[in-house]
Amino acid sequence: MAEAVWSTDTGEAVYRSRDPVRNLRLRVHLQRITSSNFLHYQPAAQMGKDLIDLATFRPPQAASGHRPDEEEEEEVVIGWQEKLFSQFEVDLYQNESACQSPLDHQYRQEILKLENSGGRKNRRIFTYTDSDRYTDLEEYCQKITTSASEVPSFLAERMANVRRRRQDRRGVEGSKLKSRIVTWEPSEDFIKNNHAINTPLQTMYIMADLGPYGKLGYKVHEHVLCILKVDSNGVITVKPDFTGIKGPYRIETEGEKQEHTSAWKYTIDNVSSLAQPEEEEREQRVFKDLYGRHKEYLSSLVGTDFEMIAPGALRLFVNGEVVSAQGYEYDNLYVHFFVELPAANWSSPPFQQLSGVTQACATKSLGMDKVAYFSFPFTFEAFFLHEDESAESLPEWPVLYCKVLSLDFWQRYRVEGYGAVVLPATPGSHTLTVSTWRPMELGLVAELRRFFIGGSLELEDPSYVRIPGTFKGERLSRFGFRTETTGTVTFRLHCLQQSRAFMESNSLQKQMRSVLDRLEGFSQQSSTHNVLEAFRRARRRMQEARESLPQDLVSPTGTLT
């Protein structure tokens, strides 16, 4: 006798769907393999051979639509997270003392309603949903290999803990969380145990009670038919895959006696209802309208016209960040910073804020230094207009000044250091480290005052870090001014430059010149343009005066009398 065609591929299949998972419907057909249905299955597997058709030996259907022995075959349509109770759960939850959790009491009420309405629609096929304890325990005890003597590794245990829902730890509405959401000082073990990504999953098990007739309701006879997993991204994992055109899956059970040993076959089919053409068209129209409105919203934010600047001008746009400060004496640091624009040729838009103060930040030990991470963003823009055409004038660039202070328990501040750095003249991303210093007094009294009271010397003009704006001489002397080197401040700057000079690409020489040289060329072009415009106006006036004269005076052919 030929062997029947069974599906041996029990691996999982992955699907992706944008539709709500609640519309998923599966049809599970379970049947015991007996001599009659086994022979009936042979012709389908041996198509094209001269075999006797045994379909006539198939047992007739009963008037009720079921086979005479309802324990031999069952077919159920199951929805996503639909709960079908097993005989074991029915017997368990009928005893009120066995109900311990609110979910157990809910299951008890549902079972009592089913008993009053005529009983369950299923006999052997049942389900475990994402809320059941079986889902947590099965995922925690799941093996990675097929070895019977497998010992789970540390990584396997950690990943099992990541995937568990921890049903017993779900908080009740209105209760206070016992665990901290943010761990401010994580230990090395905490970092090692919590580095894995936890993707939210919902799991559902389709089970079958394959016990002998009249002995249903024992855990030992429960077998997994299918495992369904759905994550928040719409990825559906089915193990094993839908039967489709493949043969049915086979399960063999063993019992203490020969009559308790049996074989079963089952199929899993996707019977989810397809969307109607009208619904698909309506959905496409809704998505098209949604995307169109989102596109219009983005267009309204960007605008239709590209913002241009005047010829000979340069627009500097800076997205900056105060990254960190390290190497200072006291804790709880904050930074006061501002941008100074040169008085000549530079300007900023109205209501432009060129200064800022970071938040107070506690330091963290990093090697021998204490580092305070601010990650404080700031943004500003400025305009440069080249108007001075004298050869002796050199363009100046904006300067970023910073002042580092510390705050104690009584809200008293101390100056920890001053620093300054010239903004980069080239566009792109730049990371700048600014070294700072602070003025100091000699003697122990000054240090005691700084420690207990918090007072310290400060600069009246912060621009004294470089060249003060009020200085008009040729040489600046700081002789006798005592300072002490302190820590460093790290800035991250993303500089953007916009100018019409960048459009000049006629020759390699122009491409290699700096933007300031191009801006100077724009000023020369502007003066030449003014001369040409004045010549055109003079020529136009001459033509108007010529047209107003009599023709006999203008005509060169006239004769003298």
UniProtKB/Swiss-Prot annotation:
It holds the Pfam family B9-C2. The keyword Cytoplasm applies. One of its GO terms (cellular component) is MKS complex. The keyword Cytoplasm applies. It is found in: Cytoplasm, Cytoskeleton, Cilium basal body; Cytoplasm, Cytoskeleton, Microtubule organizing center, Centrosome. Coiled coil: none annotated. Widely expressed in embryo at 15.5 dpc, with a relatively strong expression in brain, liver, kidney and digits of the upper limbs. Highly expressed in bronchiolar epithelium. Residues 314-442 form the C2 B9-type domain. It comes from the Eukaryota. InterPro entries: C2_B9-type_dom. Component of the tectonic-like complex, a complex localized at the transition zone of primary cilia and acting as a barrier that prevents diffusion of transmembrane proteins between the cilia and plasma membranes. Involved in centrosome migration to the apical cell surface during early ciliogenesis. Required for ciliary structure and function, including a role in regulating length and appropriate number through modulating centrosome duplication. Required for cell branching morphology. This is Tectonic-like complex member MKS1. It comes from Mus musculus (Mouse).
